[in-house]
Amino acid sequence: GMVFQQFNLFPHMTALQNCIEAPIEVLGMKKEEAEERALELLELVGLTDKKDQHPSRLSGGQQQRVAIARALAMRPKVMLLDEITSALDPEVVGEVLNVIRSLNKEHNLTMIMVTHQMGFAREISDRVCFFNEGKIFEQGPPEKLFGDPQNDRTKQFLHAVLDAN
């Protein structure tokens, strides 16, 4: 499953409809089963009460959580989360990060996350890769990469972003 910084929800569909479209069309799931699964996922992301709302009636954080539920509706083994908080108002970033924390703890889902949320990456990751100019400069467990980076470019980046916070 993939979720990007732009939510890419279908604007003419409700949150529920956004979550059932692919399972019905791609997986051949029955509508009732897809709706039941979608409601469970909307509950997981804290949006059951918004199931009948179109994306234009949802905040950015709510749209992103619908996008996460929609991706999960396909029952992926791996989730790619690409800068999922970068387009959000800073006050709602926590809503989305809390959903990811829950997925990480309770659902044992493998996630590959591209983020500039260094504190979150350190907290939630089993392994961290530092990319620069399209190449992996350094990788390892978060304790090692954040606590004792070996590469000068990694040190420079972490110093800049961690000191800014």
Question: Which residues make up each language-model segment?
Answer:
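C-terminal boundary and immediately downstream tail of ABC-type ATPase nucleotide-binding domains
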Residues: 139, 143-165
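ABC family nucleotide-binding domain
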Residues: 1-142
